[in-house]
């Protein structure tokens, strides 16, 4: 489920913010030193980039009213040297665009890259959903961005700003396809789009808006389009970035990691490039996978790539992509059953859940981690505190991190198809059963780390310079006695995974049942 933070949760954390010792050091270097992060593969260009003047202006605009200002990008990611179009519909006579690169930047979270001149605004037609629930806009381009050298690789938010200073985000990512960086940061845009109900339909919600808070509506869409904005309810158009991904990006850029940037669509289209890297970093909610995406990951792991799943419910829904009038891979298909018309001609592409017929391949087959459910709230209970994951956290066996777990959860299931030597590093009781932190790595092989909770990224949140500035409640607060040890454990994963096949130095040891 996409990250959300309500007012009650935020107000309940004010005391933590006021008195917490978890808040970051005044400098990136001091924080990195405190975490003992000197063994991390680092990038001089990224360290230099984050030393540049940051800006909090990205947080200074209230969200525009629904239907007043909306936009989307021509692609989820763009390689340096290419261009990207923004398609905007607005009731305002004009607007401007401010483009921010997201990162650490002295704790301010972003750097302003450029500001457009005034753009003439006009209302563009919202198409009616077709018989599959697809809302596929065919808008005219409002502005083209030339992605030159002034656009370093990274995650971007374009902020559409109206004359009354309200705004709406349009996310996109800048790649460097020549990169040989140790880490691939991957933004889970396929999952963002699955939950995006702009235009009235998503892969969960439809005309009836029934079911569990609108989820699993019988009239939901079977095909959704990337040619549409993200809804206002998705963090003012930012998709699922600010809640389920930004806390990790903020930390990673603070540490100056040797990192390149992909979306999940890039895994589909250029997954062969994983061989140039040491680790793939999957973030808070990475649920929707095409066969090409899954094959790229499993092949790379068998060849020594490390993969971290810092969320839960990963590789669960099987999808395929189709072209639209506006480009290839702009439509995402997910029937969730054998009613998928492709069953008649190519059943292996039928968009069932991955573990169901005719696919029959659960995520546990190479991870040892199986989806458990949506009621994953609870406290994390540490096992095997002497292992590498918990080093320098100050935690001992049986230590409890209160309220560290939430959202969906994964666990180790003995009756599932699992790889050998699945090691359980924490096992915790949650509302829906048991949540497990797992690790698996064959001798000299690639390692796979699974946090087992949808809140691992949430637990990294630590934005002391930003909370008072945010419009609404988009940024999660730190959690007392949780944020530091989870940050430390995350750095331990990065330290191990950034050095090559994790099994060469840290093969997993099967945890007794």
Cite the ranges covered by each PLM segment.
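C-terminal segment of N-terminal export signals and the immediately downstream linker at the start
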Residues: 3, 24-58
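Extended acidic/polar, glycine-enriched regions
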Residues: 95, 135-179
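Extracellular low-complexity, Gly/Ser/Thr-rich intrinsically disordered linkers
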Residues: 254, 267, 416-511
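An acidic, glycine-rich "communication" segment
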Residues: 315-432
């Amino acid at each position: 489920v996409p990250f959300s933070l309500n007012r009650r949760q935020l107000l309940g954390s004010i005391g933590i913010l006021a008195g917490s010792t978890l808040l970051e050091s005044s400098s990136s270097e001091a924080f990195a030193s405190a975490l003992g992060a000197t063994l991390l593969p680092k990038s001089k260009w990224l360290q230099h980039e984050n030393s540049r003047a940051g800006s909090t202006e990205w947080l200074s605009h209230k969200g525009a009213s629904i239907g007043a200002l909306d936009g989307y990008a021509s692609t989820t990611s763009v390689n340096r040297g290419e261009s990207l179009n923004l398609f905007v519909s607005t009731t305002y006579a004009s607007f401007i665009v401010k483009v921010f690169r997201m990162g650490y930047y002295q704790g301010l979270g972003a750097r302003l890259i450029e500001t457009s001149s005034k753009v003439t605004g006009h209302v563009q037609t919202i198409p009616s959903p077709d018989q599959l629930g697809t809302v596929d806009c065919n808008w005219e381009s409002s502005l083209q961005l030339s992605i030159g050298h002034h656009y370093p690789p990274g995650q971007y938010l374009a902020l559409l700003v109206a004359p009354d200073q309200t705004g709406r985000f349009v996310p996109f990512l800048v790649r460097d396809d020549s990169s040989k960086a140790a880490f691939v940061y991957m933004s889970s845009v396929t999952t963002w789009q699955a939950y995006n109900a702009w235009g009235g339909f998503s892969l969960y919600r439809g005309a009836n808006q029934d079911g569990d808070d609108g989820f699993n509506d019988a009239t939901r869409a079977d095909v959704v389009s990337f040619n549409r904005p993200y809804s206002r309810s998705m963090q003012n158009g930012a998709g699922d970035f600010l809640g389920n991904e930004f806390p990790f990006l903020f930390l990673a850029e603070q540490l100056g990691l040797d990192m390149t940037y992909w979306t999940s669509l890039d895994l589909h289209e250029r997954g062969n490039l994983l061989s140039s890297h040491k680790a793939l970093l999957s973030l808070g909610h990475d649920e929707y996978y095409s066969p090409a995406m899954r094959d790229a990951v499993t092949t790379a792991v068998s060849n020594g790539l490390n993969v971290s799943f810092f969320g839960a419910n990963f590789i669960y829904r099987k999808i395929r992509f189709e072209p639209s009038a506006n480009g290839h891979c702009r439509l995402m298909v997910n029937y969730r059953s054998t009613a998928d018309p492709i069953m008649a001609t190519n059943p292996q592409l039928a968009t069932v859940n991955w573990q169901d017929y005719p696919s029959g391949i659960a995520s546990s087959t190479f991870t040892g981690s199986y989806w458990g459910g949506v009621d994953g709230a609870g406290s994390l209970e540490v096992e095997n505190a002497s292992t590498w994951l918990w080093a320098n956290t100050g935690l001992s066996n049986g230590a409890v991190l209160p309220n560290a777990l939430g959202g969906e959860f994964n666990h180790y299931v003995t009756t599932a198809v699992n790889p050998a030597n699945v090691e359980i590093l924490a096992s915790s009781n949650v509302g829906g059963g048991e949540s497990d932190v797992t690790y698996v790595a064959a001798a000299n092989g690639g390692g796979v780390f699974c946090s087992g909770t949808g809140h691992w990224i949430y637990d990294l949140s630590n934005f002391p310079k930003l909370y008072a500035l945010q419009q609404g409640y988009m940024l999660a607060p730190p959690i007392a006695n949780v944020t530091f040890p989870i940050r430390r454990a995350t750095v331990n994963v990065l330290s191990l995974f950034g050095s090559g096949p994790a099994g060469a130095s840290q093969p997993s040891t099967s945890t007794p049942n």
